[in-house]
């Protein structure tokens, strides 16, 4: 089971340090984080009921581990989002909690944390801001953004029996960005 749900409100972009409000923050954290917790837990419970072992993979982000780099957003049409790293850090910790609880049922739980992905902005037809992309690439040792194809093999590996003794881990796929 791969959980990559991404529910958010229309006010998601307003969740900056300067423009957020408590209601918007709480609503988005509830939608996004609870979708991961609830759906993954329901799936794990079903696996236990059916006596099925396997893998649950939660899609997180490097921003669940490192802070957003403010200078990447300067001069762009993007801004930091104060809810996003809170949500992703919560997903990472939930992974560890689930792994420790469901390990006895031979259910593995891991996260995949991509760096900046090449392509359209999540849930929108807009392409990424060119200045943001240039700044991001300049900080990345591999000098490019993550492509969806860069993620396929880690998801396949974690879904397979080749990872039968791996649980509670966060797999960062960011071309070295988090090292800088």
Show where each model-derived region lies.
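Catalytic loop of short-chain dehydrogenase/reductase
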Residues: 6-9, 18-24, 48, 57-90, ...
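A short, exposed helix-loop element centered on a Lys and neighboring polar residues
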Residues: 40-41, 96
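Short, small/polar-rich loop/turn modules that mediate ligand/substrate recognition or access, typified
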Residues: 103, 108, 166-168
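Short C-terminal tail/terminal secondary-structure segment
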Residues: 156, 167-180
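A conserved structural motif in NAD(P)-dependent oxidoreductases
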Residues: 140-151, 162
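Conserved NAD(P)H cofactor-binding loop of Rossmann-fold oxidoreductase domains
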Residues: 4-12, 176
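A glycine/serine/threonine-rich, flexible loop-to-helix segment
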Residues: 15, 69-74, 104, 114-140
């Amino acid at each position: 089971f791969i959980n990559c749900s991404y529910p958010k409100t229309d006010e998601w972009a307003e969740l900056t340090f300067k423009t957020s409000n408590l209601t918007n923050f709480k609503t988005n954290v509830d939608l996004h984080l609870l979708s991961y917790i609830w759906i993954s837990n329901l799936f794990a419970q079903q696996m236990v009921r059916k006596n099925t072992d396997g893998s649950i993979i939660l899609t997180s982000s490097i921003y669940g581990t490192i802070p957003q780099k403010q200078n990447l957003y300067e001069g762009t049409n993007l801004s930091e989002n104060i809810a996003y790293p809170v949500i992703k850090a919560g997903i990472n910790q939930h992974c560890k909690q689930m792994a420790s609880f469901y390990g006895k049922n031979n259910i593995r739980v891991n996260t995949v944390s991509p760096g900046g992905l090449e392509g359209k902005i999540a849930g929108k037809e807009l392409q990424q801001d060119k200045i943001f992309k240039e700044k991001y690439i300049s900080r990345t040792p591999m000098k490019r953004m993550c492509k969806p194809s860069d993620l396929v093999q880690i998801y396949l590996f974690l879904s397979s029996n080749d990872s039968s003794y791996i649980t509670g881990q966060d797999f960062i796929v960011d071309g070295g960005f988090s090292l800088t």
